[in-house]
């Protein structure tokens, strides 16, 4: 970066000047300035801030203000090139070292670091295992260490990386170099674990609000998941970029093919694809408009695509942390976005079964995480309030999630629950048998299936006693009893057994109220966040909307020519402001949020030309 002349009496450039000149913003978000000034002064920090909340500036600005190079530890090898490209577009001297580089490129980056010609250097955590790397870093001047995605140090987290456990040693080797650890996802317990494992107990801590008000949360019963997803995309997100998460590789391939066959541009992404294919699909998703990525959780961490309009889950995430982080990839630009999930009985059975693996401590942790996820799915209260409470924060009903917009009915399910639990009990006591949910429902409905006849279950006194409910309603009952811990899943085949908590219900000592699943319907287009469309130009005046489209077309051509994602040139939010205010001079353009000095020099005249050519 070109030197910044300080406006103060000190020789150190001021953070606010860097914010305006380099990044093009006039003011900091809540908490940013305090943390930045603390790190600039040489202090350690631990930052918990939601995706899209401005975490990166908390280390990027101190790295530009302090003498030396900011060393950023990041697990996101596949994204380092894009991160560096985005910084270079701002005039920041950035580089990376990882296993994907050619030898010559690595030599150039190393020489730049040793010559003091880098503001930021990105490294994967595994490189710091090497004494050779540590000695190399010692030969240059380090401004700070930034530990990105710091939740990876948590052994109980959903993204645990063993190499992160070694990062506490950085302070031992460089005791005078400040450290800043950052994550978008951490409960109070995980927060404490990060601080303890990285030796940051005495650091300055910033816990920003976890609420993402532009995201609308919607969870519906899983019935025909492919069709439900297709309805969502066609009625609410036609032509939008989005991510669809599935639990297995085979599901990813099937859903991607299904969407393609229905005219929706979709790409698969999972660990079973070769590295070149994964890289190509990721690059297309970042650079092209309107693509849908169908993926396992192997995809998404660090994806800085601001205009992802929806994140859909076709399988239940294993934890609320995972769900929050995955849904947080939508709407990074602050515009309306949707977090949608189809959730059903088989999800609960499958994850309950997985939670029986491992040692006792691991099993207990997995069950606790799953219980919290199930509570979020089955709540009759505001989903946003429930989500924030999980992270130790208060909230009030948002009026914007599915449970606020259409409050679910509850019903007295005591008798049906007793019938189901009694069926499980009788099979176990009288026949020494255990079965899965489907067979139990067949017994209750009085279906003489081949399996029912084979085991003579038509002779049970409970055979046919549950005809007052449909099969779908019985599946909802089983799902909720599993979520409440009144039933448990056992063994390879997912058979159901009673728990100690089921006894009071069986004896009639505990009444049971369950959530009634809503009748499937088309999503309400008027119920988008803020009551407006998710389309970036939806609320612009006609002339501004036309200009916005022209600016996006110019941006797409420019990004293609430069070989970078479109958002590296400008975010939609910046183009919206340009279209709305219609600046006529470079001076006026420089006042737009997101137009820093380097981008003004690089793109200013071209933008003014687009504005002048507006018919």
What does each of the following model-derived ranges do?
Residues 310-315, 377, 416, 476-477:
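Eukaryotic partner-binding/assembly regions in large regulatory complexes
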Residues 362-391:
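Short, charged low-complexity linear segments at domain edges
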Residues 2-16, 365, 394-615:
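Accessory DNA-binding and partner-docking regions appended to nucleic-acid-acting proteins
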Residues 2-22, 26-30, 34-46, 50-56, ...:
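Helicase motor core with emphasis on the C-terminal RecA-like subdomain
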Residues 27, 303, 379, 431-432, ...:
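Helix-turn-helix/winged-helix DNA-binding modules
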